[in-house]
Regions:
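Catalytic zinc-binding patch centered on the HExxH motif and its immediate surroundings
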Residues: 2-8, 17-40, 49
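Post-HExxH zinc-binding segment in Zn-dependent metallohydrolases
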Residues: 73-99
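Active-site recognition of the HExxH zinc-binding catalytic motif
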Residues: 57-69
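Short, surface-exposed, polar/charged, turn-prone segments marking secondary-structure boundaries
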Residues: 35-36, 42-46, 67-70, 86, ...
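Short, function-defining helix-loop hinge/capping sites that tune catalysis or transport
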Residues: 19, 69-73
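Short pre-active-site segment immediately N-terminal to the catalytic Zn-binding motif
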Residues: 37-58, 73-74
Length: 99
């Protein structure tokens, strides 16, 4: 799966950017910011490169935050266990599609 540079939710463009330094300074792999409609991702944790699988999981995790925030479901968006499980199920559903 390729990670998009942007996608839309309710007509709002969500940009996907890469910033290893910023996220390493915050000790996170990814971040969704509602105020800027932006997902920031990292490809490393310190000097260690993240696996492609970890990066894709992180993208789906942050995308789930974006979806829930756009739905005004802040409580669910703040529930990291829910977001983590839901994002993994969403990834599996999309990646296992057959046509």
């Amino acid at each position: 799966m390729k990670i998009p540079s942007k996608f839309k939710l309710f007509g709002t463009t969500i940009n996907v950017v890469w910033d290893n330094k910023r996220l390493n300074d915050q000790s996170v792999y990814g971040l969704y910011e509602y105020s800027t409609s932006e997902i920031t991702l990292s490809t490393s944790q310190g000097v260690k490169e993240l696996s492609k699988d970890r990066i894709i999981d992180t993208f789906y995790h942050e995308r789930t935050h974006a979806i829930l925030d756009m739905m005004n479901e802040r409580g669910l968006s703040e529930d990291e266990k829910f977001v983590d499980v839901f994002s993994k199920l969403l990834r599996q559903a999309i990646e296992s599609e057959e046509y």
